[in-house]
């Protein structure tokens, strides 16, 4: 489909029943629409699921601008293209930050919001400031710098290392889901434009997250307070990328937000405990359908 002047690749599951609520899934870094395949398979009986490739990721070509605003505008255009009614929006990590921005700036397009460990902090648990700055430098060094760092890396070994870093126990991830993650990483390693997308989008995210701590209308803190749609926040108890303390902080900022902390999981609970995450999402959306006047 075309959205915001760009051809955007989307994947449907659970389609064919107009009575089903429609949900739009937004992935994070080193991901694509395929990232959601395990979760959408569990939800496709209750929802019509649409997972998109963000600009520069998967099969969607690179955009002119990687700012959070520009990415959010593309997601908004996709939401308008897939439905005449507001849709349920679900995002993880970087995709969660974009989904948060979308709900605050385009509430007319969003029926509900589900944030799964959204990226709302620049200070991962256990990292010293020096290490934080080193990580930021490497990720923001530009596509060429990131390509040099990843040159010669094996996709399966790199995926395994990343998942071990992000998850409390990556050994429990379904083998098919792991293979999908490997395919995404392999695609990124082979495609210079994809590495550029990873680097430039992370640089834009870093700028957005820095504004979380500053006053002004563009601060992420103020953006969160503007959200009026029903919101569920799902967070891994052992998230070392964005510690769970930020979940409670974010839940206090978003009016009426409901927080579910998933035990035994890290930054990717939808991969680590898909059944539990699917149940939380399904219950959240069902509650909205059953009590439309109360949400």
Regions found by a protein language model. Give the residues of each.
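Conserved HGGG/HGGXW glycine-rich cap/lid loop of the alpha/beta-hydrolase fold
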Residues: 6, 11-61
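Conserved alpha/beta-hydrolase catalytic His-Asp/Glu region
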Residues: 150-223
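Acidic catalytic loop of the alpha/beta-hydrolase fold
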Residues: 214, 238-242
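Catalytic active-site module of serine/aspartate enzymes centered on a nucleophile-bearing elbow/loop
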Residues: 255-295
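Short glycine-enriched nucleophile-adjacent loop
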Residues: 96-107, 113
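Flexible "cap/lid" loop of the alpha/beta hydrolase fold
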Residues: 104, 113-153
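Short beta-strand/loop motif that positions the catalytic acidic residue
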Residues: 227, 233-235
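Conserved acidic catalytic loop of the alpha/beta-hydrolase fold
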Residues: 70-87
């Amino acid at each position: 489909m075309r959205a915001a002047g760009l051809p955007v690749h989307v994947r449907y599951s659970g389609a064919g029943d107009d009575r089903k609520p429609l949900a739009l899934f937004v992935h994070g870094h080193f991901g694509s629409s395929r990232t959601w395949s395990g979760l959408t398979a569990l939800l496709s009986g209750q929802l019509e699921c649409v997972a998109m490739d963000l600009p520069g990721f998967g099969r969607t070509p690179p955009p002119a601008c990687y700012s959070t605003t520009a990415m959010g505008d593309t997601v908004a255009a996709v939401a308008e293209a897939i439905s005449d009614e507001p849709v349920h929006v679900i995002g993880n990590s970087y995709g969660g930050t974009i989904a948060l921005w979308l709900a605050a700036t385009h509430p007319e397009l969003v029926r509900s919001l589900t944030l799964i460990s959204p990226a709302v902090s620049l200070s991962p648990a256990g990292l010293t400031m020096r290490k934080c700055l080193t990580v930021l430098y490497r990720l923001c060094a530009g596509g060429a710098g990131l390509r040099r760092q990843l040159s010669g890396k094996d996709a399966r070994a790199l995926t395994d290392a990343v998942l071990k870093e992000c998850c409390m126990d990556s050994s429990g991830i379904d083998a098919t889901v792991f293979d999908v993650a490997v395919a995404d990483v392999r695609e990124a390693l082979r495609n210079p434009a994809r590495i550029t997308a990873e680097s430039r989008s992370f640089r834009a995210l870093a700028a957005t997250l820095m504004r979380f701590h500053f006053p002004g209308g563009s601060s992420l803190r103020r953006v969160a307070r503007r959200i009026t749609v029903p919101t569920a926040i799902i967070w891994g108890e052992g998230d070392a990328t964005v510690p769970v303390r930020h979940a409670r902080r974010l839940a206090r900022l978003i009016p009426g937000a409901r927080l579910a902390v998933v035990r035994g999981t890290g930054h990717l609970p939808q991969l680590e405990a898909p059944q539990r995450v699917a149940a939380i999402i399904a219950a959240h959306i069902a509650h909205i359908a059953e009590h439309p006047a109360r949400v």
